[in-house]
Amino acid sequence: IKPTWEKLPEDTTEDTLVVELDPGTAFGTGMHHTTRLCITQMKKYLQKGQKLFDVGCGSGILSIIGLMLGAGEAMATDVDPNAVAAAIENAKVNHIDMSKYDVKAGDIITDADFRHTCGDEKYDLVLANILADVIIPLSGVIKDNMKPGALFVSSGIINTKEDAVREALLSNGFEILEVTHSGDWVAFTARK
């Protein structure tokens, strides 16, 4: 992951997956622990051709990497229109096929109509790298967008909120497959 204004390191090989990124005012440079936790889980679980949903997409880094890793299509949403603009621009910089990438501004937690326009029971993998205080209510509604057996990877969770997120996932019927840590941060991988 490199800023658009920097050159590639000389030791970069042809096999290296390079993502160019200009987050603008949106979160997501790829350097934060939570972003790396999500990328690691996505690389582990995403299968070629699967449908990906990036909730709270910020710069679009997770959905862009997902498409570069072989996702068949991706939806990205954020409540901030500036984040949506940044995600679209970053997708273009990385030569993402925009017919496979849809980015929308809206709140899937409070706006059921918006949530349903994003796709009912459509996604194989949902990523949410946002705050625990958002993941907790999100866990109560995101299943509407997930296929049976789909995975939900959530991070942006400070370790002091780990138990609250675990309880929300379990009480909303998720099966927790993995809990990963980096620094003071936590990621959950859960199955619908």
Indicate residue ranges for each PLM-predicted region:
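S-adenosylmethionine
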Residues: V79-K192
